[in-house]
Structures are given as C-alpha cells and as structure tokens.
C-alpha cells in the first residue's frame, strides 16, 4: 500500500489502524540540534485527542506519544525520529454486526474493491485515528518553524449554517470548539446538542493561516507552495474542498480588484493568500477547508453488503457529530509539515540566491 509518506526533505511516514494495537510515524529530515521532548508533542496531541469534551466522540484515548529514536538527551540527532502511540480504547465489537456491510459515505466499498480485503473495525487504515501521528509529526515541524519566526494557526469558522463573523485568535485558544467568535460558539454548541438528539451530523469550515513566511518558498511548477498545501489539506479525512486566498470568490472579482497592488510600503491587499506563481510573497498565507458531515450516524440508511444484497444500516460506535472540531489541530499540523519541507528545500536549492528587490511584506 503506497501513499503513506508525505514530504521530500522533511518527510513523514505513518502506519497503524484505528483498532490495531498502536499507531506510529517515522519523521525523516529533521535537522540536528532541535530541543525536543515528548511533552512538546503531547501539547499538540491533547488538542486533537478524542473524548475531551461533550461535543466530540465518546472514544477516550490518552494519545500518549513515545519518542523511540532520533532524540538524545532532549536534542534531535538528525536521524530518523520514531514515534508511537498505543490504542487503548478500542471497541471492535461495535463493528462486528456490519463487517460484511458497506457504510455509505465511508471508504469501506472502495477499499474492498481496491484491495479485496479490508479492516472493518472503525475503518482500519482509512480512519481519522491515523491523523494522531500527523499531529505529533506536525508538532516537530511547528517547533522548527517557530524558530524561524513563523506561526501557524487554524480556527473553526463555520458549522452548518452557523458562521463566525470574525476570528479572535485568543478566543480560539480558550474554547473547546476552536472558534474565534464567542457568539458563534454558543450557537454551535446548541447545534451539536440538537444533532446528538437527532443522531445526525453536520459539516464544517476551517481557516488556516501562516504568518512570518518570507518571500521565496515554493518550487514551480508542480511543487508550487499552494499546490502542496492543497494536497496536504485534501489528504485529511472528510475534507472535500480547499481554497487558497479568496478561493472561489475570485470568479466574481475583476482584475482591477483582485490584483494585489504593491507600493514601496507594502502590498495593498492579499487576495492571493500569500502565494504568487506558487511562491510565497511574504504576506500571510491563508486557506479555507470544507469538511463533509460524517456518515457514521444513528439514522437508518440504505446500502449493500459485500455480495451486493441491499441492506439497512445504522452505524454504532462512537463518532463526532462534527468532525471539523478535532480537525483544527490536524489542519495546523499538515500546514506546518508543508512549510517545514519547503523551508528545507529553499535552503538546499537557493541558499546562495541574491536579489536587490526589497522585501515589502515586512
């Protein structure tokens, strides 16, 4: 099964299934000399882990990460960093009744066609449980980026019809929904309570931004910074759309409005989202991500079994009524992984590049 690795110079490979004994990751390319402890990674994992509040899945996992290699006396050695998280709260019996039945909207049907065999327990490899390792690896990337003055942060900006009118980043850090609008938080909480009563789910939208990225990062033409960012974000479970900058709003914009005019004192706008020609402009990089509502709900639906017979299905188990909540730290992690990779690529390929053009983004 290829497709389990991401990145070129800062590269991660993950392994493990939702109901297997453990999840793991190998991080290659981290420079030597970075101070790193399990506590650094745990802080990020605690923001993502299940069972933390009444608005997410009831599955409770400690998500205690272990650093197996690549760190000696609290400092990275430049060798591969091995990470491991043990699964401790599996309830595989929740899926025994549907082991031969395909859950609509999930990867059951497509995995069966691709491999001829699948782990039916919680989706196996296709489960969002895998993203715990992305968050752990992303925490390493984030620490590297912060040393360069770069900050990556994300927020829940929409849940169903409830839209946040603004993003107060301090507010994002203080509430369990990662939403930056206190008024929207209350409406979202009420929506989740209603969804739980109905046994249904809802979609969401997330905004991610990176500040402090200097001009020049990105590798045209196929490894454009925004292309790699879009791929990274689209690889997250349930993500169905990614837009960079003004995204789909550019359809109704005119060139005179959309172009980000420049003056000696800086850019006059940032419709491009901090990327021009696939290369960072030095302005804040931002993107929006749309996530579908989970199909694991308590409402009966139509499907088929592995032999093609029609079946009715009600998904048991413990699931998030809105996957967008716990996706926020995952979005941050994937963004950090992309930026760390492009930071190393810029150093490797263009370290001696010089220009007389001033950096007007500062």
Swiss-Prot record:
Superkingdom of source: Bacteria
Keyword NAD: no
PROSITE patterns, per the entry: CHORISMATE_SYNTHASE_1, CHORISMATE_SYNTHASE_2, CHORISMATE_SYNTHASE_3
SUPFAM superfamilies linked: Chorismate synthase, AroC (SSF103263)
Cofactor remark from the record: Reduced FMN (FMNH(2)).
Known EC number: 4.2.3.5
GO molecular function: chorismate synthase activity; FMN binding
Binding site for NADP(+): 48, 54
Enzymatic class: lyase
Cofactor: FMNH2
UniProt catalytic activity: 5-O-(1-carboxyvinyl)-3-phosphoshikimate = chorismate + phosphate
Electron transport as UniProt keyword: no
Gene3D superfamilies the record matches: Chorismate synthase AroC
Pathway linked to the protein: Metabolic intermediate biosynthesis; chorismate biosynthesis; chorismate from D-erythrose 4-phosphate and phosphoenolpyruvate: step 7/7
Any Gene Ontology CC annotation: cytosol
BP term (GO), one: chorismate biosynthetic process
Xref: Pfam families: Chorismate_synt (PF01264)
Subunit architecture: Homotetramer.
Function: This reaction introduces a second double bond into the aromatic ring system.
Family, similarity comment: Belongs to the chorismate synthase family.
Name this polypeptide is given: Chorismate synthase
Organism of this sequence: Idiomarina loihiensis (strain ATCC BAA-735 / DSM 15497 / L2-TR)
Species lineage: Bacteria, Pseudomonadati, Pseudomonadota, Gammaproteobacteria, Alteromonadales
